[in-house]
Design a protein with these regions (language model features):
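Membrane-embedded transmembrane alpha-helical bundles that form the catalytic cores
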Residues: 1-394
Length: 394
């Protein structure tokens, strides 16, 4: 089920909002002095979130519940076992990465081993929807508890709510636990929240249905197939259409998630900030999928040493992982390394002289490299990718 489905818009969402508003009344009337002032609302949201997820993944909903239960136990262990809290964190991280690796990357790694002459059975495992997002949120929870930036969640249902919340479960943004921990147990919904949230949701829906879907048709018209007859003009039209499609699609889903969250009393962080207006690739990645960027910055880049030591290596690791996170395919790895190289070069060259370069030149420079990056991102077949770039540059 996706937000643009008619069933979601005219059946699921109205029914959920009705039940949620009734549960809000129950919380106010039945639990005015409780320490958990959102118990009924949380239970309602969890039930509908599991239905939402099970609609497309009836079996994998149990995988998500098991994953949450493991993190629930590990989180409590980190907080209670002072002497072994680091060991508990490591166990939790390994469990999360094993689940993600098994379902997302096992087939890819098996194919790589087969390509170098080893005989390895290639598992046929379908990818659970949203597993990359909810795995990273689970990791965020464990690390925030370990760093004492948040307390462990003592109610399993509330942790399940954090991980499975349907507004951001499928396509983000990645919600940091320390930013919503208080709202899980105590949040208030005002008329202003509902109005602003609804407006944001419909803006996102318009981006997806009116703009992204149309640009998708244009991109597919030029970039699908064997590409043997693709002209330079066709290549540019196709990749520019895809550049616009992926922005309106992804930012549209983020707008809908943020808007729905606002209607429910949650304040999710922004995920996009006019990224195509950037004057460098470094700036672009501060404005594109901001929740993923902040995750890698705070949980990978800075712990590795950040700007203090081995900066180039740290950047490479982050961008290699960024590429892997987007998909189990070589083109995504190349795409990540491509941007990692550019960001590294910018730190040592462009960013030191950027104020002397005309803005229009910087914008054109950034857009060109972004478009080339989306070309790498689009094609999983290297033959098609080669034909595309040969056509793109004549």
């Amino acid at each position: 089920m996706v937000f643009s489905d008619l069933f979601f818009l005219f059946v699921f969402l109205p029914l959920f909002m009705l039940c949620y508003m009734l549960s809000n009344v129950c919380d106010k009337q039945l639990r005015p002095n409780s320490t958990n002032k959102t118990a009924v609302r949380n239970a309602t949201l969890v039930v509908f979130s599991l239905i939402f997820y099970a609609w497309g993944e009836p079996m994998y909903v149990f995988l998500m519940i098991i994953s949450v239960f493991i993190n629930y136990l590990v989180g409590i262990g980190i907080e209670r076992q002072e002497k072994h809290r680091k060991f508990a964190l490591i166990i939790g991280l390994i469990c999360n990465l094993l689940i993600l690796g098994t379902f997302k990357y096992a087939g890819f790694f098996a194919e790589v081993l087969c390509s170098v002459g080893l005989t390895v059975p290639i598992p046929k495992i379908s990818l659970p929807i949203g597993i990359s997002f909810y795995t990273f949120q689970s990791i965020s929870y464990l690390i925030d508890v370990y760093r004492r930036q948040a307390s462990s969640q003592r109610r399993f249902v509330d942790l399940l709510l954090y991980v499975s919340m349907f507004p951001q479960l499928i396509a983000g943004p990645i919600v940091r636990y320390d930013l919503v921990a208080k709202e899980i147990n105590d949040r208030h919904i005002t008329r202003h929240d509902v109005v602003e949230g609804s407006y944001r949701f419909f803006i996102g829906l318009g981006k997806k249905v009116i703009l992204a879907n149309q640009f998708s048709e244009i991109a597919n018209q030029f970039l699908q197939g064997e590409l043997s007859g693709l002209t330079m003009q066709g290549a540019w039209v196709g990749i520019i259409a895809f550049t616009l499609q992926i922005f309106f699609d992804f930012s549209g889903y983020s707008d809908m998630a943020i808007g729905l969250g606002r209607c429910l009393g949650f304040h999710f962080a922004e995920n996009f900030d006019h990224p195509y207006c950037s004057r460098s690739i470094t700036e672009f990645w501060r404005k594109w999928h901001m929740s993923l960027g902040s995750f890698f910055r705070d949980y990978v880049y800075i712990p590795l040493g950040g700007n203090r030591r081995h900066q180039a290596l740290n950047i490479f690791v982050v961008w290699f992982l960024t590429g892997m996170w987007h998909g189990a395919s070589w083109n995504f790895i190349i795409w990540g390394v491509y941007f990692g190289i550019i960001v590294t070069l910018e730190k040592y060259t462009l960013l030191k002289v950027i104020r002397y370069i005309p803005r229009v030149v910087l914008h054109l420079y950034s857009l060109l490299l972004i478009i080339i990056g989306w070309g790498i991102f689009y094609f999983t077949d290297f033959t098609h990718m080669q034909r595309f770039f040969l056509s793109l540059f004549g």
